[in-house]
From Swiss-Prot:
It catalyses: a lipid A disaccharide + ATP = a lipid IVA + ADP + H(+). GO terms for biological process: lipid A biosynthetic process; lipopolysaccharide core region biosynthetic process. The gene is lpxK. Pathway: Glycolipid biosynthesis; lipid IV(A) biosynthesis; lipid IV(A) from (3R)-3-hydroxytetradecanoyl-[acyl-carrier-protein] and UDP-N-acetyl-alpha-D-glucosamine: step 6/6. This is Tetraacyldisaccharide 4'-kinase. Transfers the gamma-phosphate of ATP to the 4'-position of a tetraacyldisaccharide 1-phosphate intermediate (termed DS-1-P) to form tetraacyldisaccharide 1,4'-bis-phosphate (lipid IVA). GO terms for molecular function: ATP binding; tetraacyldisaccharide 4'-kinase activity. Belongs to the LpxK family. GO terms for cellular component: plasma membrane. It comes from the Bacteria.
Length: 332
């Protein structure tokens, strides 16, 4: 919501509801901390990758980056997710790159495609982990989202934040974009800011595009080969994608933002594209591949994550924590 990032009077009208939201969430958290509500401890270490605020912060590229980095270190990695956008009739569901996005959810299918890691979705994270471990050998589990899912105990927490929007007006829902107060950041292990550095950054992520891939033929082209086109995005922050294309020198004749996890139909996009190249995110492409036209292209991005400050040791310390965690679980 635009007013989350301004001084709109709506903030004060909605603030009583935010107070109620905060009280309920604090009570719920306290019940888990006191052991009054039960939580699940997985037999393998769990890393949560989540957000403090709603809206596109760049969480999925961080999950992909983290899984790939863990695999480079010789670890067998499994991924669990709630599976937002999934309309599967049964859960938990084992997701592969060939799972239909309407069943597996666009982000889990994308993660499975990019990492080849085993992925299981379920609103019940315990059931997701149990199915995952029954079908795959894992040394460590990455939870895509779930920072506020206190029914699942965790060993490490990573928060991904948009560097520019940060925490918005600082209010929790519905007056602001936050699911928890900013003070929650003091208890997480690592904060990655997307697109630049701010006061909360332990590390900075830049999303780097290298080429465009045709949805129908899988042909790869350098982005500099395109002069103009049309762009669509069904992600949390569509403008970030449009701005990226324009910075690469592509003149966008038209842009269309859709809601996050939008399920597309061919007719929607054919009208937009006409005879021009149509650009979309990789997350949207997994939902459009089955009915793509010849002039539809997606732009995959890779997360490049660097220290927030020169001479900083946050990343080495982070990997040290993971090594110790895995060793601890292996040794019982």
């Amino acid at each position: 919501m635009p007013f989350w990032y301004s001084n709109s009077k709506l903030i004060w009208l909605l603030s009583p509801f935010s107070l109620l939201f905060w009280l309920i969430s604090q009570l719920r958290h306290a019940l888990f901390c006191l052991g009054i509500k039960s939580s699940y401890r997985a037999p393998k270490p769990v890393i949560i990758v989540g957000n403090l605020s709603v809206g596109g912060n760049g969480k999925t590229p961080v999950v992909v980056w983290l899984v790939e980095e863990l695999k480079k270190r010789g670890l067998r990695v499994g991924v669990i997710s709630r599976g937002y956008g999934s309309k599967s009739k049964t859960y938990p569901l084992f997701v592969t790159e060939n799972t239909r996005p309407i069943e597996g959810g666009d982000e889990p299918v994308l993660i499975a495609k990019r990492t080849n890691a085993p992925v299981v979705i379920s609103p019940n994270r315990q059931q997701a982990i149990e199915l995952l471990l029954s079908q795959a050998e894992c040394d460590i589990i990455v939870s895509d989202d779930g920072l506020q899912h206190y029914k699942l105990q965790r060993d490490l927490e990573i928060v991904v934040m948009d560097a520019e929007r940060a925490l918005g007006n600082g209010f929790v829902l519905p007056a602001g974009p936050l699911r928890e107060l900013p003070s929650r950041l003091k208890s997480v292990d690592f904060v990655i800011t997307n697109g630049g550095k701010n006061q909360y950054s332990d590390a900075v992520m830049y999303l780097v595009p290298h080429f465009a891939i045709n949805l129908k033929t899988n042909e790869k082209r350098q982005l500099k080969e395109f002069q103009s086109g049309v762009a669509i995005a069904g992600i949390g922050n569509p403008q970030r994608f449009f701005t990226m294309l324009e910075k690469l020198g592509i003149q966008l004749e038209r842009t269309q933002a859709f809601q996050d996890h939008q399920h597309f139909e061919a007719s929607q996009l054919e009208k937009l594209a006409e005879n021009q190249p149509l650009f979309m995110t990789e997350k949207d492409a997994v939902k459009c591949q089955s009915f793509a036209n010849d002039n539809w292209w997606y732009v995959p991005v890779d997360a490049e994550i660097i220290e927030a400050e020169k001479q900083c040791e946050n990343l080495p310390h982070f990997w040290d924590k993971i090594d110790k965690l895995v060793a601890q679980y292996r040794n019982g």
